[in-house]
């Protein structure tokens, strides 16, 4: 199943909505923290255990993106979106069965494994297509689509909280909420499957598109078109520097995002104005809004100031934000909330900017497959971030600590990880020409046509 080629006159601005319909759906993953307290209560789980479906989903996201990236390039975005629809929706249906029967392993398998595969394939499905449609503004194009993944929880978080209030927070209410999620997302994601189009070869190879594709990245010198294969990219230090950059940025962001609802309640549990469950769900929605805004805002900014400079901002200022939370967050809700919002905007911006960073370094030839392989950094971060925050919080609670003290050590670790990412970003340099593929030769028919045209004046 391949996506139909766009007819003449097809507007490229119809493609981002197709990507958004998929990314807004799979972005529900960022609202998992809303389900954590009910699951812990209904199934007698610890905070570390209730994070397992989310952690495994992120692991499977990276693995399926890495191993499926080349197939997505070959089979096209419509095939990928269909696979994502089936897996993601089926994951919720299996989780509903697991909750109804009080079998936590089935929730882990359904949401974490099956749903995680849908996350990975769905996440990368529109990326290379968008870059081909928008060679002149790759940061903007991928930001428009990928912001949907960050904004998915903006819808899913209050929606899930409302369903749990209506259905109840016992295992049957959780099962009903999972069931509604699965059926609703199946319908919504089908819109993307029906709408997606790939650019016509003539349009992709037009002089304007070719010139835009060869345009240098902001701050870079003009040069020949870069073409690096996915296999060749793995042999470059640039790929692994970006792997570290993405892993550190995601670990720092996902740690706070996965535990956002219980974290803000713990931080201010002993204050004169504790945070209610509904207010905590609203905080998760705010974080999702910042995540979404960062994906479009910061990725568009990278088209102006350059990818390396914008990652300096993400990692350097991000480390400062974590430090402020550690030092002053427990004493001030505004400081805690503002710093968390800035961090999540950087977290989202990092995801949306990375495809354009890859395009600048490796070209568009196999950027989708390269992006898929890089997302193994997300898999690693999906384990590290929640594990660091949840395990240390459980350990501190067992030691008799409460409030902000539960998170001081883990958030300090996040500060250090962002510094490591900052150093890795500084090490990124242009890819050495020895890794470049030869420029494609013009088809014989085109060459013959050019020869014929050049000879016409002589025969006249």
Language model regions located:
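Hydrophobic core of transmembrane alpha-helices in multi-pass small-molecule transporters
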Residues: 104-121, 335-349
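C-terminal transmembrane helical hairpin of 12-TM major facilitator-type secondary transporters
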Residues: 246-255, 279-357
């Amino acid at each position: 199943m391949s996506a139909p080629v766009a007819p003449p006159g097809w507007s490229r601005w119809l493609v981002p909505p197709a990507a958004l319909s998929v990314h807004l759906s799979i972005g529900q993953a960022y609202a998992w923290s809303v389900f954590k307290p009910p699951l812990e209560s209904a199934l007698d789980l610890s905070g570390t255990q209730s994070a397992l479906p989310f952690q495994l989903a992120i692991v499977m996201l990276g693995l399926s993106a890495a191993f499926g990236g080349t197939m997505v390039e070959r089979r096209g975005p419509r095939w990928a979106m269909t696979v994502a629809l089936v897996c993601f929706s089926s994951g919720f249906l299996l989780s509903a069965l697991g909750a109804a029967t009080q079998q936590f392993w089935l929730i882990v398998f359904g949401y974490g494994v099956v749903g995680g595969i849908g996350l990975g394939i769905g996440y990368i499905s529109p990326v290379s297509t968008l870059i081909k449609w928008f060679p002149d503004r790759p940061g903007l194009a991928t930001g428009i689509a990928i912001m949907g993944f960050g904004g998915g929880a903006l819808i899913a978080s209050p929606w899930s909280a409302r369903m749990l209030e209506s259905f109840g927070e016992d295992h049957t209410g959780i099962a009903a909420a999972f069931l509604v999620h699965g059926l609703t997302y199946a319908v919504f994601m089908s819109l993307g499957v029906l709408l997606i189009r790939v650019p016509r070869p003539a349009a992709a190879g037009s002089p304007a598109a070719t010139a835009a594709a060869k345009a240098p990245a902001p701050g870079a010198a003009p040069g020949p078109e870069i073409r690096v294969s996915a296999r060749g990219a793995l042999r470059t230090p640039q790929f692994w520097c970006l792997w570290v950059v993405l892993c550190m940025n995601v670990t720092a962001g996902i740690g706070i995002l996965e535990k956002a609802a219980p974290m803000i309640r713990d931080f201010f549990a002993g204050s004169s104005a504790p945070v209610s469950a509904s207010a905590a769900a609203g905080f998760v929605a705010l974080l999702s809004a910042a995540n979404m805004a960062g994906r479009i805002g910061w990725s568009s900014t990278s088209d102006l100031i350059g990818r390396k400079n914008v990652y300096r901002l993400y990692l350097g200022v991000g480390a400062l934000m974590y430090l402020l939370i550690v030092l002053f967050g427990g004493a001030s809700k505004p400081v805690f909330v503002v710093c968390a919002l800035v961090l999540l905007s950087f977290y989202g911006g990092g995801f949306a900017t990375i495809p354009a960073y890859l395009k600048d370094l490796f070209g568009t030839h196999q950027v989708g497959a390269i992006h898929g392989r890089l997302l193994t950094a997300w898999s690693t971060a999906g384990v590290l971030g929640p594990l660091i925050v949840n395990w240390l919080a459980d350990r501190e609670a067992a030691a008799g600590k409460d409030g902000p003290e539960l998170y001081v050590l883990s958030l300090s670790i996040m500060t250090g990880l962002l510094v490591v990412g900052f150093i890795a970003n500084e090490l990124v340099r242009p890819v050495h020409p020895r890794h470049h593929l030869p420029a494609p030769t013009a088809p014989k028919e085109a060459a013959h046509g050019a020869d014929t045209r050049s000879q016409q004046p002589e025969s006249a």
